[in-house]
Each structure stands twice: as C-alpha cells, then as structure tokens.
Amino acid sequence: MPRPPKCRWVRSEPNVTHFKPVGVPMSMLDEVILTVEELEAIRLKDLEGLEQEECADMMKVSRPTFFRIINSARQKVADALVNGKAIRVEGGNYRVYEEEQRGHRGMRHRHGH
C-alpha cells in the first residue's frame, strides 16, 4: 500500500484560477488542470528565480519531489500554450502559510481533488 502524499507548503491561494485563449468560448476549449502546488513551484522557480533546493525547502518536500512537481507543471503549461487549451488551477495536497491578524504565522490545510 503506497504511503499517503505529504502536504506541500504554498504562500497563498491563487487569486486567479482560470486562463484561456482570447476569443474562444470555454465550451470550445480543452482544459489543463494545474494543482496549487504546481503553480507554487512555477512561482518559486521560474518567477522568483530560486534554486531547486531552496524551492524544495520552502515547499517542505524533497528535491526529487520538487523536480517532479515543477516538471509536471511546466509540461501542463506548455501543452496549454502550444495547443491552445485553457488552464484551471485547483486541487492538490497543500498547506497555506498566512499572516494572521495577531502577527504570528498560521496555516490552513487543504486537500484537493
């Protein structure tokens, strides 16, 4: 029996969860599902420019696990861009770091689809 996946840590819930080619109705598009942790991996590595080891540490996963997450995310984004598909961000197995009103670090736990 495989062991259950560990939660990955992300900075925040995404503000935008749908992306699509302009001028094409959603009903006409195939869709790629990007998990919240895959989006976080893209943010850390490709937007922030961190090294994979730093990214893995921030998400509380091993380097090989981070490598699998980022590769999956990049493949999905490339598929959507090249083939004109919509991207929906949802689901995954992650925890969110949050600043609470009292000023200490808190977290929310989410399990996706």
From Swiss-Prot:
Record InterPro entries: RNA_pol_sigma_r3/r4-like, UPF0251, WH-like_DNA-bd_sf
SUPFAM superfamilies, alphabetized: Sigma3 and sigma4 domains of RNA polymerase sigma factors
Pfam families attached to this UniProt entry: DUF134
Alphabetized Gene3D superfamilies for the sequence: Winged helix-like DNA-binding domain superfamily/Winged helix DNA-binding domain
Entry coiled-coil feature ranges: none
Family membership noted in the UniProt record: Belongs to the UPF0251 family.
UniProt cross-references to HAMAP family, sorted A to Z: UPF0251 (MF_00674)
Protein name as annotated: UPF0251 protein Teth514_1147
Organism name: Thermoanaerobacter sp. (strain X514)
